[in-house]
């Protein structure tokens, strides 16, 4: 991996934002419909704000979160030993998801399925990071964190993702608690109401966390076989490419 500096990471993010701004604008506009932002038909016209977008989205989310989850590896003509191995794999995957949900619950977040259902319906994309992580005591835990596609940035290579980054805002006290770093240096007088942009960056080997100005976590091997991020648009519509830009927000230029 290249030894990325905060400036290089932010440059990648800014360039990708420029390329995908129509998509992110659409995501934000869809969320406004869900929040029932008041509709203004213009001067001289009566306006009515329908709750249909919110009701419809909530119905889809409820279907997705209440459906029975099935993890199945087909037996086929496998012998008894292979069938038992497949059963163990199914139980392992179910246990991984359960462990991931428990970690999210401790962090006061909805479960994996709940978050992904919401993002799928409201953003039209799914995204997240999945890793097995060792803590300071050497214990391994499951870390599955859904990401909001609105704040997810990525680059593609020959075999898929070449890098991915999740941009969030955190307070100085949160940064201190998570990474044990004083933003602005020791004794810096920063109001804890100040939100600081934090970039959680992954490539196929390393993970780096930084702000606009400093590294919070230096390049660390994440142990994955590639970029440990899952990401994609919802549905079966391929990323088609029009001869000219259509403005319909469904061509490759808008993704």
Predicted regions and their residues:
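Extended, helix-rich architectural segments
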Residues: 1-209, 215, 221
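Extended, charged amphipathic alpha-helical segments
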Residues: 209-255
């Amino acid at each position: 991996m290249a030894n990325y500096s905060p400036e290089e990471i932010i440059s990648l993010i800014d360039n990708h934002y420029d390329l995908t701004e129509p998509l992110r604008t659409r995501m934000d506009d869809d969320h406004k419909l869900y929040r029932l932002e008041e509709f203004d038909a213009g001067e001289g016209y009566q306006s009515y704000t329908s709750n249909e977008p919110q009701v419809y989205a909530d119905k889809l989310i409820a279907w997705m979160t209440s459906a029975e989850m099935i993890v199945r590896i087909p037996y086929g003509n496998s012998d008894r030993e292979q069938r038992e191995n497949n059963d163990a794999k199914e139980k392992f995957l179910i246990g991984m998801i359960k462990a991931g949900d428990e970690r999210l619950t401790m962090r006061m977040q909805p479960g994996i399925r709940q978050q992904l259902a919401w993002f799928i319906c409201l953003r039209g994309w799914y995204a997240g990071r999945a890793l097995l992580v060792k803590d300071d005591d050497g214990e391994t835990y499951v870390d599955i964190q859904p990401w909001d596609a609105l704040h997810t940035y990525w680059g593609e290579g020959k075999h898929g993702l070449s890098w991915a980054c999740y941009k969030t805002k955190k307070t100085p006290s949160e940064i201190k608690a998570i990474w044990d770093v004083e933003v602005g240096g020791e004794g810096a007088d920063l109001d804890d109401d100040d939100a600081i942009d934090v970039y959680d960056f992954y490539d196929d080997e390393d993970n780096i966390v930084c702000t606009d100005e400093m590294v919070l976590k230096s390049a660390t091997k994440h142990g994955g076989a590639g970029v440990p991020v899952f990401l994609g648009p919802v549905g079966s519509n391929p990323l088609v490419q029009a001869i000219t830009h259509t403005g319909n927000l469904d061509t490759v230029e808008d993704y």
